[in-house]
Amino acid sequence: MELLGQKVKEDGVVIDEKILKVDGFLNHQIDAKLMNEVGRTFYEQFKDKGITKILTIEASGIAPAIMAALHFDVPCLFAKKAKPSTLTDGYYETSIHSFTKNKTSTVIVSKEFLSEEDTVLIIDDFLANGDASLGLYDITQQANAKTAGIGIVVEKSFQNGHQRLEEAGLTVSSLCKVASLEGNKVTLVGEE
């Protein structure tokens, strides 16, 4: 997605050779028009897969996921990082390690909203080592739901997340692939 790639190159801030900050349009302030295009693109890629639900994790995955859900005309469900007191019925649970925060969180999804009748598209803002996507995939498996694929907004292709997801048998669609953050510069796949 050319527009997204331009935005990553122009507004992304390289923190170090493994961390890219995109707070200006995705992780803090959200460019709604860009996220709408992200959602539309995911719809075009997965529209024939019978998607009944979009699944993501709070918080940064919500914007692209809700835009995709709008285009699919299906609910957007997000895994919570804390169990609210209102969640009294059953839930699915898994542990996810955040590469950026270097922290492991237990995330939950209510059994009320995910079942074996669902065909799920998992959407996440970043793909580094693949732990978040694999954790969400684990939740869909616990629910006996079908996973149609994984939609990633920004993939750090120099890390092993894409490979791990494919090894798990998952279809992965990354809209922007970053080849390198070396030299304090964003280099996209195809520009090396």
UniProtKB/Swiss-Prot annotation:
It is found in: Cytoplasm. CDD domains: PRTases_typeI (cd06223). One of its GO terms (cellular component) is cytoplasm. InterPro entries: PRibTrfase_dom (IPR000836), PRTase-like (IPR029057), Pur/Pyrimidine_PRTase (IPR050118), Xanthine_PRibTrfase (IPR010079). The keyword Chloroplast does not apply. Keywords: Cytoplasm, Glycosyltransferase, Purine salvage, Transferase. 5-phospho-alpha-D-ribose 1-diphosphate binds at residues 128-132. Pathway: Purine metabolism; XMP biosynthesis via salvage pathway; XMP from xanthine: step 1/1. Its main location: cytoplasm. GO terms for biological process: purine ribonucleoside salvage; xanthine metabolic process; XMP salvage. It catalyses: XMP + diphosphate = xanthine + 5-phospho-alpha-D-ribose 1-diphosphate. Its EC number is 2.4.2.22. Xanthine binds at residues 20, 27, 156. GO terms for molecular function: xanthine phosphoribosyltransferase activity. Homodimer. Converts the preformed base xanthine, a product of nucleic acid breakdown, to xanthosine 5'-monophosphate (XMP), so it can be reused for RNA or DNA synthesis. Belongs to the purine/pyrimidine phosphoribosyltransferase family. Xpt subfamily. This is Xanthine phosphoribosyltransferase. It comes from Staphylococcus aureus (strain bovine RF122 / ET3-1). The lineage of its organism: Bacteria, Bacillati, Bacillota, Bacilli, Bacillales.
